[in-house]
């Protein structure tokens, strides 16, 4: 009898498949997102050297200043994280990125995050 696959296993399988195709370079680093049940995280990564260039999350002190709360899991919170990471990326001169949705469906928080990043000036 085939083993039932959990949501997490399916997401990790999709993530592996995506990572084979998506690779960040110095000219066009990878914008990677992760969402847990309580928080939302985003990083811009240069995969050639394996360094995180910019990061932001709902645990960030700047997020707490803007929203007045620590942590968050709503669509609005994902948009605030997008504003923070887009601003930091543009300050470092990063305008073009490759979007890595981390195996999550392009829907809800992930879509809102991507739309806000585009609105702030990131191209992907």
From Swiss-Prot:
The keyword Ribonucleoprotein applies. Pfam families: Ribosomal_L18p. Keywords: Ribonucleoprotein, Ribosomal protein, RNA-binding, rRNA-binding. CDD domains: Ribosomal_L18_L5e. One of its GO terms (biological process) is translation. Signal peptide: none annotated. SUPFAM superfamilies: Translational machinery components (SSF53137). GO terms for cellular component: cytosolic large ribosomal subunit. GO terms for molecular function: 5S rRNA binding; structural constituent of ribosome. Belongs to the universal ribosomal protein uL18 family. HAMAP family: Ribosomal_uL18_B. This is one of the proteins that bind and probably mediate the attachment of the 5S RNA into the large ribosomal subunit, where it forms part of the central protuberance. Part of the 50S ribosomal subunit; part of the 5S rRNA/L5/L18/L25 subcomplex. Contacts the 5S and 23S rRNAs. This is Large ribosomal subunit protein uL18. It comes from Aquifex aeolicus (strain VF5). The gene is rplR.
């Amino acid at each position: 009898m085939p083993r039932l696959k959990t949501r997490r296993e399916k997401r990790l399988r999709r993530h592996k498949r995506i990572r084979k195709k998506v690779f960040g370079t110095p000219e066009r680093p990878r914008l990677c997102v992760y969402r847990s049940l309580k928080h939302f995280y985003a990083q811009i990564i240069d995969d050639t050297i394996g360094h995180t260039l910019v990061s932001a999350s709902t645990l960030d002190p700047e997020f707490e200043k803007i929203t007045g709360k620590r942590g968050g899991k709503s669509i609005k919170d994902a948009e605030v994280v997008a504003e923070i990471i887009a601003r930091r990326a543009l300050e470092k001169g990063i305008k073009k990125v490759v979007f890595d949705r981390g195996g999550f469906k392009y829907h809800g928080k992930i879509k809102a995050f991507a739309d806000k990043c585009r609105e702030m000036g990131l191209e992907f």
